[in-house]
């Protein structure tokens, strides 16, 4: 019994320490596109050709945001979030225009209100600012 409690406490301690380290690794572009693909497919049941177009739009968007984020952080310090948001806005606008050609107006409205906020949540369930 004591061994079980000891193992449980050690496991809990290690988990708590790892959670606080902040070594967050961004998922790959392919993993993020796959996540969006699943959400779009389950929400709208799109044709395969439309899903492929959406996958391409999101791959371009994620590669662009990754490059921009890398460029902004290459200075060694954390960039201002407002500046980062402003520089990413053209990428978001391009992605959204592409989505508007893929989705119906009703689907796009549903995407903006229901699906996109789920993608923008951080770990722990907090939406991004």
Predicted regions and their residues:
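Bacterial Sec-dependent N-terminal signal peptides
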Residues: 1-25
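Charge-rich (acidic/polar
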Residues: 20-129
